[in-house]
Amino acid sequence: MSDRLGPKVYSIAAHRGFADALVAGLVPRYGDAEFGLAKLTLLLPSARASRTISEAFIRHFGENERQGMLMPRMAVIGDLDLDESLGALLDPLGASDIPPAVDPTRRLFELAELLRTEMGDDAPPTSALLRLARETAATMDRLLVENVAPDELVGEPVLAQLDNLAKHWQKSIHIFARVQQRWLARLQERGEVDAATRRNMLFERTRRRWRENAPDTPIIAAGVTSAAPELAKLLRAIADLENGAVIIPDLDLAMDSAAWDELGKAGQSDEPGGPTFARGDVLTHPQYHLKLLLNRMGVNRDEVQQWHRKGISAAPPERTHAISSLFLPPRASKVWVDLNAEKRRLSGVRLMTSQNSEQEAQAIALLVREAIEEPEKRVAVVTPDRGLARRVVQHLQRWNIAADDSAGQPLHLTPAGRLLLQLARLTADDFAPVSLIAALAHPLVRRGEGRREWLEAVRSIDRAMRGPRPSGGLAAYERYASEAGVAEWWDDVCKKLAPLQVDGGPASLATWLDTLSAIAEDLAGDDLWAREDGRALSRFIEQFRLNAREVGTRIASDELHTVLRDAMEQIAVRPPYGGHPRVAIYGLLESRMTRADLVICGGLNEGTWPTTPSTDPLLAPAILRALGVPGSEFRIGLSAHDLAAALGAPEVVLSRSVRDMDGPAIPSRFLLRIEALLGDRVGEHREQQITALGPMLDREAGSTEDYPRPRPKPPGDLRDVPIKVTGLDRLLGDPYQFYAAEILNLRGLDDLDADPTPAWQGTLAHTILQRWHEARERDPAAQILPIAEAVFDEENVHPMLRGLWKPRLFAALEHFVELVDAQIDRKVVGVERKGSMKHKGVRVYGRADRIDRDAEGKLAIVDYKTGKPPSASQVEAGFALQLGLLGLIARDGDFESLSGDSTRFEYWSLAKKAGEFGFIETPLKVGSKRSGLEPEDMLPSTEEYLDQAIKNFIKGDEPFTAKLNPNYPGYDEYDQLMRLEEWQIQLAEETGGDA
């Protein structure tokens, strides 16, 4: 290598396998009988690349049955996107001539304060301000990496664009420029620099040192594709060293000159001071960033030599020709019309399409499972979709294949991170039931001894809390704890969580973190910090707490959860050790330089791979172009290069789903190009077997019989149950519902923090009316609204419900008072009275909302309704028999010693009618009514229905058929239990489509 004139730059073609081909060439060139490769220094892009090269050395020696050899020294440049630092070679200890880098968390908090000052009254809440500060820091880093000086923001190229921008862009660039100037002034005062600036300084110092005093030992830069100006200069210096070389992955040396020129100038303007990125540059091409790198290194593509070695698992050579043809720029792609078969050949590449993301994950897992049946075969799943990666990991667990996602898991999705965030949410939403139960039932809480007793208490109060959310914080749940029999346990919980109950005003973020970490540790103990996610959380808390205290960052309680979640999303928790030795799951950054026999590229849809280009929130695209900073479309080219590299594997599966979580998905532009390149032969590359096999995994063996309409026939001793006054119409209209409720004793469970149901609203209204009637017995002038207010307070009715329902309820209650006062011929003699009777050996029981007695001694049965009451026709058809049964109990039984003949039956509704809340309806045909039952027929008709029900179901042997009367307007709480959707089509056919 040292005999070459000019810069020593090499490229390894995609099909050769970069890591293995690199090692295959390094060993014979630099291997030493005595020292092995110890004198060689490899400069690599990331820590992941270092591990990949180490594994390649191990494979090389194992394949060639060679004895062990000393490994080369591996130095890491560090990938900013992976938040990696420079290795010791470039950033040695004691480098006092280079200022230290500012802590990134401190920078975040200080930038937020600077933005608040600059924006004044227009400043958003702190959570949004920190988000903007994070974006500001990212934009500053982009400029620093590209060597854009701060004063260039007011240079002629930028000023020339300002007048053409919208007002918000002009405002944002002014704010950004002022914040950057003030920030740099602060750094200068403290003797610090930004991390990106420090990297540039270290690159420049290393380059200068090696040029002035060239190292005696060889230095090879391998796999570096970043085109940052200072890094490009360092790579050129390495290429010029006598014992140096630069080895670039996947540079297309086969692309003809016309196509190469069509990519654009790539940093080489025709005139001094011209734009770095011209408008015609094809930034989305996978070779563009490599052309930019070569131009910044001052190296012509013709000077780059082919690395004439290949890896252990190299793909067919024609694969590189196909990849080159695949990504030809627009004008050059015209040659596809006459492209010969060799340059279209993609043998070993399969295309797989699934119906949705879940099926795609299952299909990918099946491919992995199939592949590892072959000894020594390595599989890599590459996808930028972390949700898809997590699903693949879960599907592989069915075969006990532990596959770690090397891209890591965001801290906020780990068990430790979730616990801290759930505690933060408690203070943000005033201890809402869902958040409270989620925090108390978290897997880390009381994980060891005592976990069972703890969960039993949590489940007890969980059941008691079902229904609409109360207001009042922790104190609102005391009566639920008492009802559930866990009052003592709840007192202990309240003491632990009490520090989170605050008035909502801003407080020190450091103090918040002290409180949250103390409570989390009190609940979970040392288990909170025991695993890698706990250690990452500990580092996060310490870093955030220290810098927040120094800067004085304050945050309101309702923003705490958002601020912590946004920050934790930026932290990836990677597994400390690998899973299956031949299975790996990578993100795009982690996949670079990796190698496998089978590479599965998942999530090949627009918006995922490539991602949707996002505009810089602070600097308009025209401003970035004027500054010579690549726009968001540059990343499309990088993702295209990642796909091109993946296509170099011996076997490749390109996978997508027709639908994603948001709806129908558009195939990736890269996938469409592949299909177009394959032309008529695309069908030969379709993967059909795996996609067909996937659905069979979860299908029961053999044929599955249709589920019949349920018709349970319990024995007589189980049938003999009492009948509620609200259950008779259910027994006749939908016997299965009666069977489930009264014989199986199954009840629907309300959700936590549920929307107010009519039943809940009815209970509240009944309580108010009961207390008002009782108060009127003591004081005829008692007012109903103060009583209603007191009931609302006792029940801790949530403020939102008070605002939405209370005005309508109170209007109806006031009208009820008027209606009661107008009935001067009646007297209320019973409120919420329980009653029962025996009828043909069956107990019939219920509660009367109100019973009045008229001047003739006859009774009026009143039933309160929060909504629309049953119609007279429904009562006549047997769909609403409650009033009639209450009348029968009053006649043949009693309501706590109250009995008599009932002649009036009324529904008092709180709903709106004729523009007014509160009205009375009767199912009887009285007055001017033209429909309804004759008064003398009300009780005989009801008794007839009761006799029929007792004869057929309670004392008889009729099956409790589901939906016996399809016209019965009952509830649907048992529809899932009866598996209605599985047989309702059959029901519709039987009833002529009336179901």
Predicted regions and their residues:
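Polyanion-engaging groove/track-forming segments
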Residues: 1-779, 789-795, 799-802, 969-974, ...
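RecB-family 4Fe-4S metal-dependent nuclease core
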Residues: 514, 528, 662, 703-995
